[in-house]
């Protein structure tokens, strides 16, 4: 069975993900999956190592809650593990400090196309990770997202599904592993090759 688009791939992933997801010590996975699960289907617990459970995540959780997400702390307030009930998010505006980790910003931007009314993200103060934000925007555009800076400190993402396109990832196993992991979760037959 072939996917009709990247959105279908991710939807399939969610349907086959375990209810408890242990990301071990992967901070990027914790941030990105937290946002991803918030717009998906089903109830999940996302957890990690003891050290991961000491790393704050309240900035992202508060932003997701402002968008209407159902995210609760399953342990200590402000830290993983998290209990996430995926659903459609209808709120579209959220504000973050510009000096937070770009991974919080990227996590929100990447789910923007899945939000019912899109996303308007305002960053306050100095934006310290603009180059990383711009990399996220480029990748999103490569997959058909309509996303742009609409002012010096504001980004807008239009609601629309991502599009499946051939995509070249530098032949570096650590970079390519994410794409192979995505395909492996889907239980679909998708053409994937290294060149």
For the regions a language model picked out, list residue spans one by one.
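A glycine-rich helix N-cap at a beta->alpha junction
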Residues: 68-74
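A short, conserved structural fragment
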Residues: 146-147
